[in-house]
């Protein structure tokens, strides 16, 4: 099927059956339809030669027909598919020639170019293929170039080498957004210098956006990793435009959280380049400039590993020399020097870590103290550290107590016996504008304590007197942060407390009283101050002055603080046995405005005074007042105490009005307890009817299901002192009270709770005996079931638990009536027969 054979009229390829198609071609020589029909017929019935003959004629007849050319070219390509391009080189060249003929008039058809280029990619024709790609790009409009570049990039990867680099360089002019793929190719091809340049270009381009979603930091990190790992293969210098040191240092300034990694990377770069001294300089710069311990640790560990590797290699070389018997003093000296340098590096580590923390916050007092401790006995460095700390720390921003640093600085000189220098330091310290008044007060106190340790007592007193200097009437607010600590320190309680203790221990009473008086003038006294001052005067037999101090303290403080002062004051006054009228006035003052919760102890003390030194009736009136004045929590106990005192002084009958008022004043639960005590008292007096009436009154507070103990006591009382009628009356009241509680919604929940508690208590008794447990379980009903039965019952009535028993007489012993199976058991049942009989 060569070109010459196809161009001449090969009449033998035209069969008799083709006449119809040939006549159609003759009648319509410019139409494509007859040719398509002819080709289709040959595809079904003709040989490959006949098909090629017809297609060749069609393309020559209609050279601008894209459809015919595409059909013909696909036919020829399919014929060669799977055949070796080298072995059948001539056939491949024929098809290449056909593509060239087609492109003469169809050079704007991208599909033809794609077919041609794909066909060329199967052949080992690199130069021809590259030139054909270039022709395609020139022939097609730029909107169609993406179709060509897709194949061109694949060709570039297969061609590799400089061909691939140059192809991609051209591609980047059109599609700079694919720079990452280009960089990957350059790295694969070992073109590291060019790859770094491309990294720098995209990082400098603010419009570049990664197609793979990488941030600028990720791209920059990839570039740095490439620079460090391929340091020897990458050309650097001004002529190339790559300055690795400047690149990494710019990243150190820009990416604060990656400084440790970048410093280590820069050092690794110089190590890879073989410049060990430069690497050591980088390590030193890194560990002395980073701001976090994490970065420091990363750099320091890399530094140590670097030094260990060098020392290890030098030791191996020394071992080899020793084996050979060679002596190299310079090499041995270098090894010793590096060993010494390594030891020094390890010794510096705590100081370097401390430097990092102080760079983070130079106002960190705690770290400055640690630095002082690191120097141990090196006095010169300790002084330098204290001096540097005082110069660096801003008192208003200090983290920790700045005053402690000053104090420790002074103590350092004190421990060395240089008190004069220590005093100079303290004198400067008390002028520092600390964050708080407390720090300044601590400094003054420490100064005085230093003088005390040196037994300069007068000097210590003078220092505290100077610290507490203030105007006669100071209007300064201790908590006013707008004022300096020096302006407010004279109102520091800590300072005055130390001052008064000091004066009390080393000075006279008069001087001590002056200090206490000054504290009261400044109105900074605390309750403890009042007590201490009063005790001091009492020890020196100034009892009246001591009482006046308590009174001044009571003017300063209100309840609840005043309660403790009154307690002490009244106790002291009573013990001194001052006039009864004066004591009464004091107690009345104490009780005036006293909160109820603090009233009970004062009333008891007041009543006891009247009992011992006054009149019993006065004491009773005080106790009666107390029952009204104390809090609700103390009222019951106060009534009990009042009743006990009244009974002991005036007999049991005198307690009746007290009981009556207590029952009226106390809440129901406590009133019930008081009723029981009242009834027991009447019973002991033989007043049975009065006791029964009290039980009847108390019954209104006691639900039989939740207060069974009350009803048991009443029942025992009736058994001992009553008769059948009084016992029936008790039972009637019990049923009526139970009915009252059944119709009161407020008690339904409490009944349920009480039943559950009752079940828990009776659970232990059930285990004692099976028979007794069975009876108890029948009597106990579920609380919710009882409520449901009550809801279904008519209002005011409770369904009977059993059928009629033939009167109110109980069955004979041993013949207990069994409940009817059809009647539900109801523990709330009320038997009305007794009421009817009573009528």
From Swiss-Prot:
It comes from Aspergillus fumigatus (strain ATCC MYA-4609 / CBS 101355 / FGSC A1100 / Af293) (Neosartorya fumigata). Involved in pre-mRNA splicing and cell cycle progression. The lineage of its organism: Eukaryota, Fungi, Dikarya, Ascomycota, Pezizomycotina. Residues 830-839 have a biased composition (Acidic residues). It holds the Pfam family HAT_Syf1_M. This is Pre-mRNA-splicing factor syf1. It is found in: Nucleus. One of its GO terms (cellular component) is U2-type catalytic step 2 spliceosome. Residues 758-839 are annotated as: Disordered.
């Amino acid at each position: 099927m060569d070109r010459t054979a196809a161009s001449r009229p090969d009449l033998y390829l035209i069969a008799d059956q083709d006449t119809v198609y040939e006549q159609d071609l003759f009648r319509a020589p410019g139409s494509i339809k007859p040719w398509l029909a002819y080709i289709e017929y040959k595809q079904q019935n003709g040989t490959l030669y006949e098909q090629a003959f017809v297609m060749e004629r069609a393309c020559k007849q209609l050279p601008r027909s894209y459809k015919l050319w595409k059909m013909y070219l696909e036919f020829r390509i399919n014929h060669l598919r799977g055949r070796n391009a080298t072995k059948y080189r001539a056939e491949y060249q024929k098809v290449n020639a056909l593509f060239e003929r087609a492109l003469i008039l169809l050079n704007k058809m991208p599909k033809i170019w794609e077919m041609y280029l794909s066909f060329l990619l199967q052949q080992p024709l690199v130069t021809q293929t590259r030139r054909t790609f270039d022709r395609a790009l020139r022939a097609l409009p730029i909107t169609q170039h993406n179709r060509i570049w897709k194949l061109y990039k694949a060709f570039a990867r297969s061609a590799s080498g400089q061909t691939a680099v140059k192809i991609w360089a051209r591609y980047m002019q059109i599609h700079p957004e694919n720079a990452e793929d280009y960089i990957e190719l350059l790295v694969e091809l070992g073109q590291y210098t060019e790859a770094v340049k491309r990294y720098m270009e995209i990082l400098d381009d603010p419009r570049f956006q990664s197609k793979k979603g990488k941030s600028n930091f990720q791209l920059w990190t990839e570039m740095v990793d490439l620079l460090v790992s391929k340091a020897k293969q990458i050309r650097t210098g001004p002529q190339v435009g790559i300055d690795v040191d400047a690149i990494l240092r710019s990243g150190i300034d820009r990416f604060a959280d990656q400084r440790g990694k970048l410093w280590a990377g820069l050092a690794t770069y110089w190590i890879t380049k073989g410049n060990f001294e430069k690497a050591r300089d980088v390590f030193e710069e890194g560990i002395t400039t980073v701001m976090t311990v994490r970065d420091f640790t990363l750099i320091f560990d890399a530094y140590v590993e670097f030094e260990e590797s060098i020392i290890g290699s030098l030791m191996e070389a020394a071992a080899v020399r020793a084996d050979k018997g060679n002596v190299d003093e310079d090499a041995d000296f270098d090894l010793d020097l590096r060993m010494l340098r390594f030891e020094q590096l390890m010794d510096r580590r705590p100081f370097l870590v401390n430097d990092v923390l102080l760079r983070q916050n130079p106002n960190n007092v705690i770290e400055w103290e640690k630095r002082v401790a690191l120097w141990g006995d090196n006095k010169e460095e300790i002084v330098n550290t204290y001096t540097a700390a005082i110069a660096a720390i801003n008192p208003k921003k200090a983290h920790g107590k700045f005053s402690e640093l000053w104090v420790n600085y002074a103590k350092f000189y004190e421990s060395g016996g240089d008190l004069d220098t220590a005093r100079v330091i303290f004198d400067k310290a008390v002028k520092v504008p600390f964050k708080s008044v407390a720090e300044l007060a601590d400094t003054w106190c420490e100064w005085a304590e230093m003088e005390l340790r040196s037994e300069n007592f007068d000097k210590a007193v003078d220092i505290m007197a100077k610290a507490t200097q203030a105007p006669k009437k100071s209007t300064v607010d201790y908590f006013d942060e707008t004022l300096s600590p020096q302006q407010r320190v004279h109102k520091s309680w800590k300072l005055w407390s130390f001052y008064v203790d000091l004066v009390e221990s080393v000075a006279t009473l008069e001087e001590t009283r002056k200090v206490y008086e000054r504290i009261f003038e400044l109105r900074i006294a605390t309750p403890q101050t009042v007590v201490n001052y009063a005790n001091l005067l009492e020890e020196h037999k100034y009892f009246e002055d001591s009482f006046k101090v308590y009174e001044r303290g009571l003017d300063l403080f209100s309840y609840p603080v005043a309660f403790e002062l009154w307690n002490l004051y009244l106790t002291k006054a009573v013990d001194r046995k001052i006039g009864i009228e004066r004591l009464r006035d004091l107690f009345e003052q104490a009780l005036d405005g006293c909160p109820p919760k603090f009233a009970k102890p004062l009333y008891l003390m007041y009543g006891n005074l009247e009992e011992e030194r006054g009149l019993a009736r006065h004491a009773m009136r005080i106790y009666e007042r107390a029952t009204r004045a104390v809090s609700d929590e103390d009222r019951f106990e106060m009534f009990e105490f009042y009743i006990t005192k009244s009974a002991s002084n005036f007999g049991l009958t005198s307690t009746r009005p007290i009981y009556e008022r207590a029952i009226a004043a106390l809440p129901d639960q406590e009133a019930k307890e008081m009723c029981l005590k009242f009834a027991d008292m009447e019973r002991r007096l033989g007043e049975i009817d009065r006791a029964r009436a009290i039980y009847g009154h108390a019954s209104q507070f006691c639900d039989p299901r939740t207060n069974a103990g009350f009803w048991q006591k009443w029942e025992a009382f009736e058994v001992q002192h009553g008769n059948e009628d009084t016992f029936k009356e008790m039972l009637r009241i019990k049923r009526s009270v139970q009915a009252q509680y059944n119709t009161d919604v407020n008690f339904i929940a409490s009944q349920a709770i009480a039943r559950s508690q009752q079940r828990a208590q009776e659970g232990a008794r059930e285990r004692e005996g099976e028979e007794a447990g069975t009876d108890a379980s029948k009597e106990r009903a579920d609380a919710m079931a009882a409520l449901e039965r009550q809801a279904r019952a008519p209002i005011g009535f409770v369904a009977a638990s059993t059928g009629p028993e033939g009167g109110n007489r109980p069955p004979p012993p041993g013949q207990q009536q069994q409940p009817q199976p059809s009647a539900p058991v109801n523990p709330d049942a009320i038997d009305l027969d007794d009421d009817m009989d009573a009528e």
